Every structure is written in C-alpha cells, then in structure tokens.
C-alpha cells in the first residue's frame, strides 16, 4: 500500500518527473517535488494542490550536497520522513566531443550521476529510521545505445544503471530496495511548465517504428514507478533495470 507514504521526486516539476509526482499523489502518497526550476515547481505544486493532492515543492539542486541536505531536512519537517526516492532530475548535452568544454561534461555527470548518489545517501538515512524504503533511478536506453554527440549523457545513464545494482546490494541490509527504469522515446511536450508546454509534433513514422506502435508518454514510466514503489506488489524486485521503450532496443534495423 502506498497510502500515506512519503515520496521525493527530483525533477518533479516537468516531464517524466511531473507524471510520477502526480500518480504518486493520486495513489495517496505525500510528495515532495524537488525541482531546480522554481517556476515549474510552483506551477506543479499549485496544479496538484488544486486537485486536493498532498504535494510540496522544495527548490533543489541535486548537484549541490547542501541543497539536497536542506531538501531532505524540509521533507522530514513537513512529512516526518522519507519512504520512496525517485532520482529523475537530469540534464543533456549534445555537442561534438571536439567542441564540448570539460566543464560541460562534468556538469552532466554531476547532475545525472553524482546527484542520484547524493540524494540516495541522505534519503536512505531517513528510510532506515522507518524500517526501509525504495529508491527508483530514472536511467535511459542511452545507457545501452547512443546517438552521436551524447557522450556525457550516455555515460551518466550507464553509470546510473551500475549505481542501481551497487546500492541495491549495499542497502539491502536496511530493507531498502533499489531499481532503475530506462525509458526510450518519451514525448514530454504536454508535461512541461506552461511557458514551454505545447502539443506533440510527431509524424506517423515516429510511432510506426516502435514495435508497440507508438511513442511513449510520461505516464508509461509513472505507472511502473507506482508498481515498483509498492512493497506488497514489488517487494521481491531489487537491483534490476526495466527498459520501457516500446520495443525499440530489441528491434533489428535494416536499410532498404
């Protein structure tokens, strides 16, 4: 049962994180939207509170240890503890390896990989006080296949999958499960903050090239998070990665 549990969702103001925060709250959870974009965080908090859902926005930079510690402290002050953490916040860099400054590489790794490590550490301390918990890392199919000029993103997501099984083993003694989800093509246009929100601009071929027959949407990931966060339903699942990509990574590609 998820009713009354406390969840932290990083990057919960927009995109996949917003869908996860919403479904968690709709299932009776108390949700902290840990978001660096204040406009997005406030909008999402107001939108969900208008529906009677129990959510709180806390401005958070997952790449900053003090910011994370402050977010966890506020979560405990408001809701009494932490039961579930979703490490979703991430940034992207698309640039030639010959043109990308080292600082840009380091920023992506810091947010996408070090951030989840920091959040896991401080949230796990609170989970232990409550007898256990669940950490869900949002990785990517880019951990296993790539497009050109995405080295830091792919490396960070590959590292996050490895961090998942490592934490699962280390934290098992505290009854904390750790899993990861690797989304494929997820269309997030309608889940952005108002100033960026728009209708998806997708072609028929975008859907047709997926064995599932369509491009994914944030709720595809959020529904799996709801299942994985529930110890009654997913209590025997830890240390593994779920690929949610409409079958794209198992499809043979031929040029005709």
From Swiss-Prot:
GO terms for molecular function: oxidoreductase activity. Keywords: NADP, Oxidoreductase. The active site is at 153 (proton acceptor). It comes from the Bacteria. Transmembrane segments: none annotated. NADP(+) binds at residues 9-33. Substrate binds at residue 140. Its EC number is 1.-.-.-. Gene3D superfamilies: NAD(P)-binding Rossmann-like Domain. PANTHER family: DEHYDROGENASES, SHORT CHAIN, ESTRADIOL 17-BETA-DEHYDROGENASE 8-RELATED. Belongs to the short-chain dehydrogenases/reductases (SDR) family. This is Uncharacterized oxidoreductase TM_0019. The lineage of its organism: Bacteria, Thermotogati, Thermotogota, Thermotogae, Thermotogales.
């Amino acid at each position: 049962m998820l009713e009354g549990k406390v969840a932290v969702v990083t990057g919960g103001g927009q995109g996949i994180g917003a869908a996860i925060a919403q479904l968690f709250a709709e299932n009776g959870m108390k949700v902290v939207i840990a978001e660096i974009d204040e406009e997005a965080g406030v909008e999402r908090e107001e939108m969900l509170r208008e529906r009677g859902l129990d959510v709180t926005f806390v401005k958070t930079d997952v790449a900053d240890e003090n910011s994370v510690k402050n977010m966890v402290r506020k979560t405990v002050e408001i809701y009494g503890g932490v039961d579930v953490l979703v490490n979703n916040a991430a940034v992207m860099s698309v640039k030639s390896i010959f043109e990308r400054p080292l600082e840009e590489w380091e920023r992506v790794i810091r947010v996408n990989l070090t951030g989840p490590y920091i959040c896991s550490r401080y949230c796990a301390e609170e989970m232990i006080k409550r007898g256990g918990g669940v950490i869900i890392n949002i990785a990517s199919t880019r951990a296993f296949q790539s497009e050109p000029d995405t080295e830091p993103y792919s490396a960070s997501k590959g590292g996050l999958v490895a961090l998942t099984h490592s934490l699962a083993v280390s934290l098992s003694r505290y009854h904390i499960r750790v899993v990861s989800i690797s989304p494929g093509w997820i269309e997030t246009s309608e889940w952005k903050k108002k100033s960026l929100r728009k209708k998806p601009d997708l072609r028929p071929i975008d859907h047709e090239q997926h064995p599932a027959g369509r491009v994914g949407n944030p709720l595809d990931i959020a529904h799996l998070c709801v299942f994985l966060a529930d110890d009654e339903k997913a209590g025997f699942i830890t240390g593994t990665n779920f690929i949610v990509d409409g079958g794209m990574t198992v499809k043979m590609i031929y040029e005709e």
